């Protein structure tokens, strides 16, 4: 019962998560095309034979009372066949990627953990600092010039801020007297309203 409850909230037991698609059931033959179907929930391309497993394990999709998430038809027993027939326009056929054992290993890299497909490998060059981009250097140089200009303007702003603060302090003293008078009037009004309310209650 606990397992069903955890599935209804989208949580999977720790051993059930599969970050990658399971390995193919047989090695790829020359010219063979595999069918991939985009998952209707997360749009990851999954091989058609494994779409049921993906939907059950990753999205808690109930295949016993299965209704297709795309067309709302009853799927029946074979979900893969339903996707092939009813949603063939979404199928993608492509050659499987080569297994990692067939990747050529670089001669200077002795660690097999960092082996990868050739299109993602670096060109055996050491990293060099890139030359500055002329377009970006215009902005960088202009920033240095604006820094010197901003120092001059900062001093002018500081002087004007001091004089502005002096003016504000004078205004505050004038407004303090007015606010004390206003406060006294408001307190008198509050007392008057209290007396009226008390007289109506009694």
Swiss-Prot record:
The record's section on InterPro entries has: DI19, Di19_C, Di19_Zn-bd
Comp. bias regions, Low complexity? 98-112
**According to the UniProt record, which cysteines are disulfide-bonded?**
none
Q: Which region is the signal sequence?
A: none
Biased composition regions of type Basic residues, renumbered to the chain: 88-97
Please give the residue ranges the record annotates as the region Disordered: 88-120
Similarity comment: family membership: Belongs to the Di19 family.
The protein in question is named Protein DEHYDRATION-INDUCED 19 homolog 5
Q: What is the lineage of its organism?
A: Eukaryota, Viridiplantae, Streptophyta, Embryophyta, Tracheophyta
Query: Which gene is this protein's source?
Result: DI19-5
């Amino acid at each position: 019962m606990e397992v069903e409850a955890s599935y209804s909230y989208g949580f999977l037991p720790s051993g059930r998560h599969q970050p990658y698609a399971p390995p193919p059931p047989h090695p790829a033959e020359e010219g063979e095309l595999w069918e991939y179907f985009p998952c209707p929930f997360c749009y990851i391309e999954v091989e058609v034979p494994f779409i049921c497993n993906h939907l059950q394990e990753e999205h808690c999709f109930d295949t016993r009372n299965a209704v297709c998430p795309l067309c709302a038809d009853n799927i029946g027993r074979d979900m893969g066949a339903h996707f092939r027939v009813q949603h063939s326009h979404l199928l993608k056929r492509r050659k499987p990627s080569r297994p990692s054992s067939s990747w050529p290993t670089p001669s200077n890299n002795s660690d097999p953990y960092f082996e990868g497909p050739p299109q993602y490998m670096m060109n055996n060059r050491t990293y060099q600092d890139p030359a500055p981009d002329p377009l970006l250097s215009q902005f960088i140089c202009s920033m240095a010039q604006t820094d010197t200009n901003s120092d001059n303007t900062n001093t002018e702003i500081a002087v004007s801020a001091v004089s502005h603060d002096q003016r504000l302090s004078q205004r505050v003293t004038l407004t303090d007297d007015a606010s004390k008078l206003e406060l006294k009037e408001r307190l008198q009004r509050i007392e008057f309203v209290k007396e009226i309310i008390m007289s109506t209650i009694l």
